[in-house]
């Protein structure tokens, strides 16, 4: 694999911005440092690309942010948290909304890379896809131009840095507690096939399996994240009885709560309902939703902190996992 600017910076013991300044023969770099970096470049047969020539020389202190849909509560909050943290470091941001279609995501990333950005943040695990080479090739290509930071997704690539919630473990633990409290027919509602959604589903299924319960396809329901659509789908299409609902988003849980009200099911006595992301929606519901706090603000802060370290030439872990916790309100009784 050919060397890139990250490799040269690491071998020379300098920041990637310093490598760029050496490439451009900047007077801001001492002759001693220039000689050291050039020796590494020559030894490794390194040919600078456009990224290496531009980084650090004409930095605009600007970070690109791409998310699928800013109307999504989780993503809107994440963008706000990122903007706040970046501002504390003196950085501005450019936002692109890509939508969810694969080609649209690729185009959005390509467009934002044409701007003068120092780093790129992708909000949400939808950018990981199914982790086939074709799904993530554009991410790896982007990471050859600027440092790439992925929120709530994971890609094995040395130039992509991931910060994510431990959604598998919290889902496993929550379902286990439901089972221990006597709930045996647990419905799982999800609205995405993203990395995060798959990890939540894995936690749900393994908790059932480890407690001797069968995994029932009828109790794994994919539905659009619209409250009334969730209510109607449960009412019209799910015939199997269930005594608890675990979801991948608070909107899905709110829809399940509407369904329970329509059916005259008492929550939490007859049915427990658990949301995800602990959004404002959780406290707007009646009764108020128990919901898993995925630590969105902390994840965004860690992402920006990691970014600054990378831009300064430090070596950091490529995967940072943040624990989650359940916020109990009025829709659970365990």
What do the PLM-derived regions correspond to, one by one?
Residues 118, 183-185, 243:
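Short acidic/polar active-site loop segments enriched in Thr and Asp
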Residues 88-89, 208-215, 239-240, 262-268:
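Short helix-capping segments at alpha-helix termini
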Residues 1-60:
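N-terminal helix-turn-helix DNA-binding module of bacterial transcription factors
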Residues 58-176, 235-236, 240:
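Alpha-helical recognition/docking segments in bacterial nutrient-uptake
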Residues 11, 16-21, 55-71, 121, ...:
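Short beta-strand segments enriched in small/hydrophobic residues
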Residues 231-334:
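Flexible loop/turn connectors
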Residues 68-77, 95-104, 126-130, 153, ...:
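Hinge/beta->alpha junction and helix N-cap segments in small-molecule ligand-binding domains
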């Amino acid at each position: 694999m050919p060397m890139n600017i990250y490799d040269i910076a690491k071998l020379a013991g300098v920041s990637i911005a310093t490598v760029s300044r050496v490439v451009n023969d900047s007077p801001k770099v001492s002759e001693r440092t220039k000689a050291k970096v050039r020796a590494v470049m020559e030894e490794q047969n390194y040919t600078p690309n456009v990224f290496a020539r531009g980084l650090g020389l004409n930095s605009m202190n600007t970070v690109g942010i791409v998310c699928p849909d800013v109307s999504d509560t989780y993503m809107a909050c994440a963008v706000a948290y990122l903007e706040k943290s970046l501002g504390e470091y003196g950085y501005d941001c450019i936002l692109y909304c890509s939508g969810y279609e694969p080609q649209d995501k690729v185009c959005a990333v390509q467009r934002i890379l044409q701007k003068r950005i120092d780093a790129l943040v992708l909000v949400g695990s939808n950018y990981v896809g199914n982790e086939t080479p074709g799904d993530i090739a554009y991410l790896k290509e982007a990471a050859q131009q600027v440092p790439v930071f992925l929120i709530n997704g994971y890609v094995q690539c040395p130039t992509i840095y991931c910060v994510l919630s431990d959604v598998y473990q919290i889902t496993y633990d929550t379902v286990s507690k439901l089972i221990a409290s006597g709930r045996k027919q647990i419905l799982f509602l999800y609205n995405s096939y993203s990395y995060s959604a798959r990890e939540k589903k894995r936690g749900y299924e393994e908790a059932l399996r480890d407690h001797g319960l069968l995994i029932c396809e009828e109790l794994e329901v994919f539905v659009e994240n619209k409250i009334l659509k969730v209510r109607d789908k449960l009412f019209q299409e799910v015939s199997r009885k269930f005594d608890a609902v675990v979801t991948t988003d608070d909107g899905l849980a709110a829809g399940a709560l509407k369904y329970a009200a329509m059916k005259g099911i008492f929550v939490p006595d007859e049915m427990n309902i658990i949301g995800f992301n602990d959004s404002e929606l959780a406290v707007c519901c009646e009764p108020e939703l128990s919901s898993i706090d995925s630590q969105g603000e902390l994840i965004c802060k860690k992402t920006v902190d990691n970014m600054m370290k990378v831009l300064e030439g430090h070596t950091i872990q490529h995967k940072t996992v943040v624990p989650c916790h359940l916020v109990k309100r009025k829709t659970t009784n365990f």
